[in-house]
Amino acid sequence: MGRYAKEPDNASKSCKSRGSNLRVHFKNTRETALAIKRMPLRRAQRFLKNVIEKKECVPFRRFNGGVGRCAQAKHWGTSVGRWPKKSAEFLLQLLKNAEANADYKGLDVDRLVINHIQVNRAPCLRRRTYRAHGRINPYMSSPCHIELSLTEKEDVVTKATDESEQAKKKLSKKKLQRQKEKMMRNE
């Protein structure tokens, strides 16, 4: 088992999943992974299923040369987007694996959030294509490694407010002096 690029802060409240040398385009997968980062698990699964059905698009921010525009990208504040079906299917499979790991650990699956997802390039696979005049050109593929970790979302606890603290507002020297004088008169 390899080392993860980022270990979770609280290992008992987290679960991980990874895939190596996956035969899916690196560039498309990188953009799809960035779209689901920091999403709750259920929302990310729904988003990826919508991408497969072309109901929601993945915004292409870095690798967007020659990528057409689509109206669904307005939701992300950009105009360039696509529906990388194979990338979405691979990520959905990894999320399913991470969910099974969380279930095994006894975590609450409905409170899981994707706090780390990373896509790295894997070694290229070489094939050949035959060209005119007896030439041969390379026909390369760009596989990738994917790793992700899910963490149970912490409940945000609001600080209890004291009435005495609210009453103690910061007063200017002038107002403090007036209060002292008023107290002296009353005595």
From Swiss-Prot:
Region (Disordered): 158-187
GO biological process terms, semicolon-separated: cytoplasmic translation
Key words of the record: Ribonucleoprotein, Ribosomal protein
The name this protein goes by in its record: Large ribosomal subunit protein uL22
Organism domain of life: Eukaryota
Source organism of the structure: Anopheles gambiae
Entry keyword Ribonucleoprotein: yes
Record-stated family: Belongs to the universal ribosomal protein uL22 family.
Positions with biased composition (Basic and acidic residues): 158-168, 178-187
A Gene Ontology cellular-component term: cytosolic large ribosomal subunit
InterPro entries documented for this protein: Ribosomal_uL22 (IPR001063), Ribosomal_uL22_CS (IPR018260), Ribosomal_uL22_euk/arc (IPR005721), Ribosomal_uL22_sf (IPR036394)
Gene3D superfamilies: Ribosomal protein L22/L17
UniProt cross-references to NCBIfam families, sorted A to Z: PRK04223.1, uL22_arch_euk
HAMAP family registered for this protein in UniProt: Ribosomal_uL22_A
Pfam families: Ribosomal_L22 (PF00237)
A GO MF term: structural constituent of ribosome
PROSITE patterns, A to Z: RIBOSOMAL_L22
